[in-house]
Amino acid sequence: DDFFNEYREHYADLVEYISGKRFVKKGGKFVEEKTKTAASEFANAFNGDDKAVRDFVKKMMGRLVFLQFLQKKGWLGVPKNAKWGTGDKNFIYNLFNNADDSVKNDFLEQALEPLFFNSLNCNRGQESIAPKAICSIYGSEIRIPYLNGGLFEEDELDKKRVKFKKEHFESIFEFFNQYNFTIDETDTDDVEIGVDPEMLGKIFENLLEDNKDKGAFYTPKEIVQYMCRESLIAYLETETLKPDETASKDKIKNFVLNHEALSFSEKEKADILKALIDVKICDPAVGSGAFPMGMLNELLPCVQILTGEAKTRVELKKHIVKNNIYGVDIEKGAVDIARLRFWLAIIVDEEEPLPLPNLDYKIMQGNSLLESFEGEDLSNMTKQESGNLFDNGETIAKLTQAINGFYIPHDHVAKAKIRAQIKENIIQLLKERQLPPKVIEDLSKLDLHENSQFFLWHTWFYDVFNRPNDCNGRNGFDIVIGNPPYKIISKDDSKKSIYDKNFIVAHGGKRNLYHLFFEQGINLLHDNSILSYITPDTYFSGNDTESLREFFVKNCEIKSIVHYTEKDKVFENVTQAVAVCIMKKNISKNCIFHIFEKDSYNQISYSALNKENKFIFKSANIIITKMKKCKNTFDDICEAYKGDVNLGLKKNFFTNKKSKNTLPLIRGVQISKYIWSPGSEYCSLTALSKNHTDKERIVFQEVANMGLKQRTKGTILKNIIAGDSCNVLFSTNENFPNKYILAILNSKAINYYFKYFNQTNHVPIGEVRKFPIPSATPAQQQEIIVLVDKILAAKKDCRVKHENDSELADTSTLEMQIDALVYKLYGLTDEEIKIIEQT
């Protein structure tokens, strides 16, 4: 943590120096604020684009971290005529110290950029002598390797002129010198105090102050390893076993977990090796590369044990990276770090520095959810057509040959030519597809292989969707794995209408990006292949995720779900219940799966999941079953809706002045059990689309954190306007008075019922409408209503006397009496009541 925190501070210092702005934490959230005067001569180079400033600093610091690893290999500052590995293991720090002050005050341009662009990215022949600028500063002729790969390729951002002070680099290099940089990140049990590439990924994902707003969270290494292993086991079972070979399943599990292959026959070994060589794995929200790296670390020993000494570790790694692993992310910075980790994974096993492979068409930037542009479908662009006006086979062949060839190391001039050829071929394919000229023109202006608007799955990963015949027509990925973003899609999201059109699960309540990633992940797979995601657990139940559950039941066979509650705190500094779901793309009506918790599990049968029970991933216990036997639900006896006004859209109608045309505005935070706290806001009556304000209505919280003991809580109000952070209901059946309904809503029984199914921080009105409400005789109702009246009177009296401090009114005894009567109405036994009381 010390390393992460100090790294963040150095990063923030450099950003602040250029832009005058810094992210500061306010209310648990990072907010960008103006903190000092910007260095205007440099800030102007970015034209006020603060994100570009952050990206510039992020990339520069990423390169500096990479150099820390390189110098530990002894590959930097190698004396002329000396062997690789004999270099200066503190090269960067010494290069800086040897420079005079004029160079130190312009160290980026005078030293680092020649090192990046004219050394590490430039083939200077066998001797690899560093440019004069570097040798002059260092004080002797030295060797610097040519690494290729792309990390040190100059881009448009690099052309910005920035001059940091010597104090900036002095501080950064002294900070780096405090830590041991070690390249190997394969061992999850490694406790050495140092910085490895896995930590580099963690740094990056924690560095993005807006990552949490984007719904991106860093996945712990242990969970990554579990998901990679379980996915690989499920894949090998599917590819190499018949359905009834139970004993062989144990052998495969032992092979993946312990790399034990002695129990396999030669044929079994050959089948497994072929499956491992052929496997295609993708993370569609790759982040800093945790899951692809995890898969590399799992595949490598499995292939090694089956091939013996036939290939070296580095040869196997290069084969796996080239043939088995793919990734996409909407953030360019994430893609840069993910590629960097793969290069480091290769370097760790290299005796001497060799040009690194190009990962431009392996780990790529793009919007994984869209393969269209301006309403035009681009997914069929590389579908071979013949006999039409145009035969596109030749163009496709040229394109795929160029993409595949790009992986091989080239100098930057050759790479630029190949990129131009690839784009030219794509534009030609678009013309052959007869797309509108305007669309083709707009596409030609974009960087097609690095943009945040769409991703050409079937073009860039043509080899995945057009596999050779010996792969049995498996067109698509074998494993899709990852931690997709968790973010509600807002009404003003520019892509919302496209998502609504393209995704089945984008309907019914609030849409979350992770819902769409589930559907897209399944779409990217071929039949009988494996998807493994870690996401919020909110899809277990709730109206907002009913369409997602239905999609699962109709398209997938869930293998298992491992559930982590909020208390498990899977993600640092985030309270979020999550679940690891492993499923197979396969329609199965007889599937049974388990939801595993820390001390228990819940068995779910597909046959029990249907439209009637909203496909809820929870088997009803005896208490729920009894409560469901009630003849009526809230929907049958009352009108219920979410607030009177939208707090965001109607804020122009809010005021602090009371008038005859306004009523008090109530927000959810003002509501508690049987009481409300008056505020100072009023809302104009003209904001209402329907006016029920003259009625006595039950008003209760719409936002209620999952961790709260009591999540259903409300009171009765009249002549108020409720914001949409409240829910509102009132009786439409004289046999069910408002005060009786309020007692049921505030009861422990209905709170237990709601919490059993709901895994969100909201109280969706659609779920409230389905609450079962017990019938009661007039006498039974009256007994409860009398108690409600006493509570309301006590709360009201207390508020008057104690200036809104409702906690001084202890009505717990009266509330316990109501709970006892409600339990009786639901027909619950003493043992069942005990379960609710202890929950």
What are these model-derived regions, one by one?
Residues 1-294, 298-300, 328-331, 366-369, ...:
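Preference for the N-terminal adenyl/adenosyl cofactor-binding alpha/beta module
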Residues 213-238, 276-292, 477-482, 697-705, ...:
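C-terminal substrate/ligand-recognition segments
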Residues 144, 155-162, 166, 185, ...:
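Polybasic, glycine- and aromatic-enriched phosphate-binding surface used to engage nucleic acids
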